[in-house]
Amino acid sequence: VFALQTRGIQVLIKDAQGKQVGLYKESHALVIGASHYTEGWPKLPGVKEDVQSVNKILEEHGFEVVTVNNPDSEQLNRVYKDFINTYGRKPENRLLLYFAGHGYTKKMSYGSEMGYIVPVDAPNPENDIDGFVNKAMDMQQIEVFAKRIESKHALFLFDSCFSGSLFALSRAIPKSISYKTSWPVRQFITAGSAEETVPDRSTFREQFVAALEGEGDVNEDGYITGTELGVFLQDTVINYTKESQHPQYGKIRDRNLDKGDFVFALGRDVYEQPAEPGDVETFNFSDIESERENARKLAEIKAKWTKWQKKFDAAYDKALKYDKDTYLSSSKKAQAWKRIVDTFRQDNPYSTEDQLIRSKAV
């Protein structure tokens, strides 16, 4: 279960002319680290440091970060669902989803390839391919999650190596910020392609952090777009790993979700801190509550007088019958009238009927 929180920082996106072309009202990140594998995969102790480093840089960029360590297959599926259901409903949010762990590419019988991310309880496919397929999360499921998000911008990063055939791979040329930047988009970046492996010391993570520290601003406009990040990671990771890793970048194959660009803002002037709230310490409803209480008491008093008047009327009717009763003596009749006058001697403030009855009874 995710708590609904926001850092209270809004991110403004402006074009080269200073015109605002977009706004992120909330920024949320899901960072998943899988290191303690139990079913035949090599453990990845360096993932713990990777997660901490990624969390830190994302928080510096205004993200509220949810961290999940060593999820099994059920937990992995649930945390993606919960995160998206909790934070992915608002159009003005930006969502970043980062997975660090093993990846795998399975050659399908029809000739294509399917990429997977591997939870800690998934068997090694070399030993148990059926068990692996049942436990691992394939890219088709990631695509389902991506389309379930209603927030305009979502960026999926995988510090894993697998086939990215489900999204449109590209070597895009970063474009300047424009109104198109704010259009909906789902972007994906992986640390490597099929048949490659990610070392425990992650060059991908190191370069991701370096990019967000400013090195990824390819066109030096004060922003890093998802496209710029993809280009930067492709260049630097290939270089620093001596071509043992080839990061993949692309957008989802959906014309409704491939026009915009995820944005990181480098300048602090683009972060808008909401105004301080006004003083609410003295706020109360005491005057309203006092008036309500007075009205309630008056209503109770009026109800009692109404009941009192009904009893007075009934007593008068009874005494009137006694007065006409030939079996009663004059003294008993007089006692009946006197008893009414003595008992109902108060003046009813809500009626004049009591005064009329009292005058007849005397």
Tell what function each PLM region has:
Residues 2-324, 335-349, 353-361:
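Cysteine endopeptidase catalytic domains of the caspase/legumain-like
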Residues 330-331:
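Alpha-helical protein-protein interaction scaffolds
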